Amino acid sequence: MRYAGTAHKVGDHIDTDAIIPARFLVTTDAQKLGENCMEGLEHGWVARVKSGDIMVGGRNFGCGSSREHAPIAILGAGMPVVVAHSFARIFYRNGFNMGLLLLEVGDDVDKIADGDDIEVDAASGVITNRTTGATITCAPVPQSMRELLDTGGLVPYVRARLERENG
């Protein structure tokens, strides 16, 4: 699993209300949620994002309310990966369950600036900043979690597994 794109860096303690404000929770449609991604942080933020770009967060990314809409909004905005110093635990599980790759890098997040061109190799846990040449190493994503991501999240994974087992 390799991803490459422009880094869109946000700060510490970005909560789920900033990622997708409550007024947009009337749908679960990824595209509609994606159109309003980070609207609680800055109006029109998502207009800078191109499909395949990568969100970069600070400490405690995804804190606040537990809502599946937040990772869906990030995916709907075209960003398949979030690299952060750290994640709120419930967001971390929700992210993988919705098919969003999340990588914790601690203080090495400071090696990535807004607008940098970065490449992520989830299997090896290596993130390369192609703008500066810096390399960040994090724990590789376990195979079981990569399987969740490969199938689009927990629900598609369970459906596929049940179909295999029950024919």
UniProtKB/Swiss-Prot annotation:
**Associated pathway:** Amino-acid biosynthesis; L-leucine biosynthesis; L-leucine from 3-methyl-2-oxobutanoate: step 2/4
Q: Which GO biological process annotations does it have?
A: L-leucine biosynthetic process
Keyword list (alphabetical) reads: Amino-acid biosynthesis, Branched-chain amino acid biosynthesis, Leucine biosynthesis, Lyase
UniProt cross-references to Gene3D superfamilies, sorted A to Z? Aconitase, domain 4 (3.20.19.10)
Q: Which reaction does it catalyse?
A: (2R,3S)-3-isopropylmalate = (2S)-2-isopropylmalate
Report the EC number(s), separated by commas if there are several: 4.2.1.33
Question: Which parts pass through the membrane?
Answer: none
Q: Which SUPFAM superfamilies match?
A: LeuD/IlvD-like
One of the record's GO molecular function terms: 3-isopropylmalate dehydratase activity
Q: Which HAMAP family does the UniProt record give?
A: LeuD_type2
PANTHER family per UniProt = 3-ISOPROPYLMALATE DEHYDRATASE SMALL SUBUNIT 1, 3-ISOPROPYLMALATE DEHYDRATASE SMALL SUBUNIT 2-RELATED-RELATED
- What do we know about how this protein assembles, alone or with others? Heterodimer of LeuC and LeuD.
Give a short account of what the protein does.
Answer: Catalyzes the isomerization between 2-isopropylmalate and 3-isopropylmalate, via the formation of 2-isopropylmaleate.
Q: Which family does it belong to?
A: Belongs to the LeuD family. LeuD type 2 subfamily.
Protein name stated in the entry: 3-isopropylmalate dehydratase small subunit
Gene giving rise to this polypeptide: leuD
